Amino acid sequence: MYIPDDLVEEIRSRNDIVDIVSSRIKLQKKGSSYFGLCPFHNEKSPSFSVSPNKQMFYCFGCGEGGNVFSFLMKYDNLTFSEALKELADRAGIELPDVRMSAEERNRSDLKNTVYDINKEAARYYHYLLETETGNNARAYFNKRELSNGLGVSGIKSDDLYHYIKNKGYNDGQMKESGLFIYDEKGAHDRFRNRVMFPIINTNNKVIGFGGRVMGEGQPKYLNSPETIVFDKGRNLYGLNAAKNSRKNNIIICEGYMDVISMHQAGFNQAVASLGTALTDGQANLIKRYVKDVLVCYDSDGPGTKASLRAIGIFRNAGLRTKVINMEPCKDADEFIKTYGADAFQKRIDDAENSFLYEVRILERNYDLNDPAGKTSFFNEVSV
């Protein structure tokens, strides 16, 4: 694409790099520059610098550097055209009709179309919640004491399909959204008769959905498939709000209900993985904002196993980790409803060091009253 150099320079000069970078990672001023943990490689000590005078960034650890355009392209996985458009919009500068390659144009147009379809779907689900169709969903949210129920999907197999179709989108675009299943019988809504939770990225765009059954049924949770705008392993539910929290940690939990309950109780640093086991990408995403993570998974066997796995992933990412004890409740949602926010804050304050947690869980596998068992236990711990 071609944009006059003077217009590119104007867009650059009207987007302060410190503002752009600090909206995505935490920075601290040292001398005339700002420093933070590099978002492009794992490190424990801040070596990522941003110079307001030079309007440049540079990492002394990995060598990554550049201006506001290159930072946005690298961090948000954008093309130059997309980064230029985002910064122009932010500065209130109207771009002239520009030339993109066919591939760039098609990719950009498709991403924007899928964002628009997702936004329309979120509106539709919210609308249904206020109709007779949403009676059961409203009762469900009230029972769970959730004040911000976000929507409900229709009972029929093609409610959303016809709604989106009538908005002027074609089947090719709708298929790319992941909201519909196409087979020999035609098109069907992926989500039916479920309470719906829009998944919003750190740029506040709807990238997908999670749906939960209101009674019996499998799967209990159903998520959007991966699409051109939705990568499960590189996003976290609730991070769009948690990244702006004033807390110096992030709480990782299992489900949407846990996140919503925590946010309502004032713990707006809570996030959840998106129907998958925690990934390295999600750990690195968290690392962009904080150094400390509190693991708050379910207190049952699978939750304990998931906690142990998460501790290893966070450790490899260079994050400090503690574990919140939810017993005698199953999860944070149940705990907060039973004991309240103050009691939950006490559990946060008393969170267990991750190494001590690992040792305590490992201890269950050995008879420490038996010399051989005790020896085996200490050998295992020392590995």
Where are each of the predicted segments found?
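N-terminal structured subdomain of primase-like DNA metabolism proteins
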Residues: 1-101, 339, 346
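A general alpha-helix detector
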Residues: 20, 67-71, 120-124, 136, ...
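C-terminal or mid-to-C-terminal helical accessory/interaction module adjacent to the motor/catalytic core
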Residues: 321-383
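Phosphate-handling DNA/RNA-contact segment within nucleic-acid enzymes
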Residues: 15, 30, 106-121, 139, ...
